[in-house]
């Protein structure tokens, strides 16, 4: 007759040291069968592994909190007043008006909304880059300092109707001027990098009360989600397997219905057709003809590029790096295709020093100024 197995559990203490776990004393519950401990090579590693997964999950999950305001600004597409790619060519019709009324997302340090968080110069018109680790919750306190209703709608993360920030019945879909709303999002496994992705991927957020107009307004930003176990630290969601990262938005801003603050060359347009073309700003991060600055890395740096595409049927872009190649979902290339709504994350090893071109490869987009430079300097 088969003996009856009696199982009981006994609390034991075990000191655990693991790079992505805080040190401390944790309680394990080893299994006893028929009054005898069954510490076999099959049971113990599996049990400890299960417990470590539980501890890791609890240790890494966090709530990331941000304070963001929407504000009216003046934006200059070419602050230098020059074509910095081909100086002898000038800015042509796209330089006859350069400064326009826009709106931007601005990040602040806390709920007083008094001290701005400084952004790298290369971010240009983009709103703050938010970050999360897989499993995190994200809380965004949004203050509308603009003169019209706005919102924040995020791609890729999980939310309910109240927090969609778009056309659902939720109160976050329509934040009136002077009002505030706190968005609650979740970066779960469906928001995190997939099997063919790098250790972090980019998602887009933007205003969605009048989405088309508000994208051209400049109300655009990104959130980067890092795979669990790949962050630099629990309080630093940046991926640990890269040295530098950049985000670039390829978008033709249609300024034909927007107020011009000042003209660039004080010249009248020759025709309505020329005016219409001149107000189409073929920009990378809101700058034209090489006026986007700050894309600099050191030789041998591991660089991640987060690419965003937005716009209409004319916004079919091909981002091209001179001098280097990138790895895109396992494919080696030096050109990445972007459609409106695209969000792509690619990796590069910066090997060759130089002041390289970075541009859209569509011919008339090159002519209209959708180009800049990125620099690789020798290792310091």
What are the roles of these predicted feature ranges?
Residues 45-55:
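Bacterial N-terminal signal peptides
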Residues 60-150, 154-172, 267-303, 376-378:
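N-terminal, post-signal-peptide metal-ligating segments of extracellular/periplasmic oxidoreductases
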Residues 243-322:
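Surface-exposed interaction/gating patches
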Residues 31-34, 42, 57-109, 139, ...:
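Extracytoplasmic entry segments of secretory-pathway proteins
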Residues 141-151, 157-161, 165-233, 336-380:
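Extracellular/periplasmic metallocenter environments
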Residues 311-314, 318-329, 337, 364-366, ...:
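Active/binding-pocket-proximal capping segment
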